[in-house]
């Protein structure tokens, strides 16, 4: 009796304990989905002890729980979904090494691995441009951009002049705490003279001598992204005057103000100013200011607090940088026109379309059409479809005669043949943009909604003297 018990015990042990040896039937493991291989008594035979939810000799099928009346059915390897992080399981005759797995995981953006279990570090490919700092997130990343850049990848520049120097910002938008009066009140250094590079005997703003807390303020008329400021001094009665240091404040309503702080502290930032009366000095704001009003508070001045200045930045949405008319990035051959005027019918005084560049200098420094009618146009080929969000126009003088475009329409095209005139969405008719009122002041119009096109045409609608134009387009080339 004892001998028979021992025999049965040995048999039970041989059946219940997996034997793993070199060349064993269980090496490699033929059981899938974590099944345990149990060698059989006969050579080459085995059985699989399957985990819960799997069945078949190799544990390759998933048990689907059915209703009481139905028999359990096999749902395949994709139920339940073995893929993590929203991965999609697809049936496939795929192998992992020597093992047939029966499925593959299609991973969403930002994940990889057999089961989409790994978060990809997107910062490894350095997606942030122009000095942006990348932070890896779950299935994503973010870029901390320098003040003068913006966009998902810091790809958009945001440091164009906002219009103090060019005149887009009007006299009424520039105010100050006080005005200096000299020569028995005959000389008045008003705040609206505080325009960068302004010429003349009185060419800057100066605060009154008894003003203990002077400031100068710019009303941008809408909330904008301000990324920097350029300051400049001036000479008064032959004496250099300038601001050596200053603080900046900003507001959205002109009543409640916040001082610009040193990043990460509650300390007011003191910006370095000028060292002479004429050299411009620029400071950038990182992070940028988003506000309608900007104030500059002089802290230390040489003699009197005297200032010429320009604000830098862009619209809140970004994508409002000069596209290259003034800089020359847009080349001469890209600018064409309906007709050309020659003063005194002389070739040396030909007002060609390539000269229609904002702030162009010289005797012949703009485009003038050969005819004064509403069929004239100036065209710019941007070479690729471009997002155009604004336009700046300017007139010129022909031998002392003031000439400018008082109003205009815009048209756009992608092939240069089929044109669409920009519409006023509210009135559902062609939009007529307000142009210039003199030969030199910049006039900016925002194009909202923007134009997406390769070719842009300016269609003069009214004019003074002759149709004469200098211009700049604003926008950006769309990037993913």
From Swiss-Prot:
The highest taxon in the source lineage is: Eukaryota
Q: For the EGF-like domain, which residue ranges apply?
A: 24-60, 74-117, 119-155
Q: Which PROSITE patterns match?
A: ASX_HYDROXYL, EGF_1, EGF_2, EGF_3, EGF_CA, FA58C_1, FA58C_2, FA58C_3
Compartment(s) of residence: Secreted
- Keywords, A to Z? Calcium, Cell adhesion, Developmental protein, Disulfide bond, EGF-like domain, Glycoprotein, Metal-binding, Repeat, Secreted, Signal
Q: Which residues are glycosylated?
A: 73, 88, 140
Which interval of the chain is the signal sequence?
1-23
GO function terms (MF aspect): calcium ion binding; integrin binding
Q: Which SUPFAM superfamilies match?
A: EGF/Laminin, Galactose-binding domain-like
> Does the entry feature the keyword Secreted, yes or no?
yes
- Mind telling me which InterPro entries this protein's record contains? EGF-like_Ca-bd_dom, EGF-like_CS, EGF-like_dom, EGF-type_Asp/Asn_hydroxyl_site, EGF_Ca-bd_CS, FA58C, Galactose-bd-like_sf, Neuropilin_MCO_CoagFactor
Q: Which SMART domains match?
A: EGF, EGF_CA, FA58C
The UniProt entry annotates the motif Cell attachment site at 96-98
The UniProt annotation places Ca(2+) binding at 119-120, 122, 136-137
One Pfam family matching this protein: hEGF
Q: Name one GO cellular component term.
A: extracellular exosome
Q: Which GO terms fall under biological process for this protein?
A: cell adhesion; positive regulation of cell-substrate adhesion
| Domain F5/8 type C: residue ranges | 158-314, 319-476
Q: Does the keyword Transcription regulation apply?
A: no
- What are the disulfide bonds? 26-37, 31-48, 50-59, 78-89, 83-105, 107-116, 123-134, 128-143, 145-154, 158-314, 301-305, 319-476
Domain remark in the UniProt entry: EGF2 and EGF3 form a rigid rod via an interdomain calcium ion binding site, while the long linker between EGF1 and EGF2 lends considerable flexibility to EGF1.
Instruction: Summarize the protein's role.
Output: Promotes adhesion of endothelial cells through interaction with the alpha-v/beta-3 integrin receptor. Inhibits formation of vascular-like structures. May be involved in regulation of vascular morphogenesis of remodeling in embryonic development.
Question: What protein name does the entry list?
Answer: EGF-like repeat and discoidin I-like domain-containing protein 3
- The organism's taxonomic lineage, starting at the top: Eukaryota, Metazoa, Chordata, Craniata, Vertebrata
């Amino acid at each position: 009796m004892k001998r028979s018990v021992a025999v049965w015990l040995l048999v039970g042990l041989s059946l219940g304990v997996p034997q793993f040896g070199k060349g064993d039937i269980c090496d490699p493991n033929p059981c899938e989905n974590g099944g345990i291989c149990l060698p059989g008594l006969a050579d080459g035979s085995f059985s699989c002890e399957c985990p819960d939810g799997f069945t078949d000799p190799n544990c390759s099928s998933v048990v689907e729980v059915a209703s009481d009346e139905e028999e359990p059915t096999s749902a395949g390897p994709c139920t339940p979904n073995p893929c993590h992080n929203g991965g999609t399981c697809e049936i496939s005759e795929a192998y992992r090494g020597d093992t047939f797995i029966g499925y593959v995981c299609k991973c969403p953006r930002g994940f990889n691995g057999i089961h989409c279990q790994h978060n990809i570090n997107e910062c490894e490919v350095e997606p942030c441009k122009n000095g942006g700092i990348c932070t890896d997130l779950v299935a994503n990343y973010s870029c901390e951009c320098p003040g003068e850049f913006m966009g998902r990848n810091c790809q958009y520049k945001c440091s164009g002049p906002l219009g103090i120097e060019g005149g887009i910002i009007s006299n009424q938008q520039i105010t100050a705490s006080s005005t200096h009066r000299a020569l028995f009140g005959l000389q008045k250094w008003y705040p609206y003279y505080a325009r960068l590079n302004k010429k003349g005997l009185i060419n800057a703003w100066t605060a009154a001598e008894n003003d203990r807390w002077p400031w100068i303020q710019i009303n941008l008329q809408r909330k904008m992204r301000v990324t920097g400021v350029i300051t400049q001094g001036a000479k008064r009665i032959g004496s250099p005057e300038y601001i050596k240091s200053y603080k900046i404040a900003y507001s959205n309503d002109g009543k409640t103000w916040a001082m610009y702080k040193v990043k990460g502290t509650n300390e007011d930032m003191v910006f370095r100013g000028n060292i002479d009366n004429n050299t411009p000095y620029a400071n950038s704001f990182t992070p940028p200011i988003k506000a309608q009003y900007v104030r500059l508070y002089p802290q230390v001045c040489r003699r009197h607090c005297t200032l010429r200045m320009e604000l830098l930045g862009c619209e809140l949405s970004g994508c409002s940088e000069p596209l290259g008319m003034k800089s020359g990035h847009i080349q001469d051959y890209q600018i064409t026109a309906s007709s050309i005027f020659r003063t005194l019918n002389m070739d040396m005084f030909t007002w060609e379309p390539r000269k229609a560049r904002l702030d162009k200098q010289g005797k012949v420094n703009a485009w003038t059409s050969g005819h004064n009618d509403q069929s004239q146009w100036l065209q710019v080929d941007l070479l690729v479809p471009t997002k155009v969000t604004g336009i700046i126009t300017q007139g010129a003088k022909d031998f002392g005669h003031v000439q400018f475009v008082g109003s205009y329409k815009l048209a756009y095209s992608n092939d240069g043949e089929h044109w669409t005139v920009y519409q006023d969405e509210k009135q559902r008719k062609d939009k007529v943009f307000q142009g210039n009122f003199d030969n030199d002041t910049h006039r900016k119009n925002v194009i909202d909604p923007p134009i997406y096109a390769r070719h842009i045409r300016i269609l003069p609608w009214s004019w003074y003297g002759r149709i004469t134009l200098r211009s700049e387009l604003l926008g950006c080339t769309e990037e993913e």
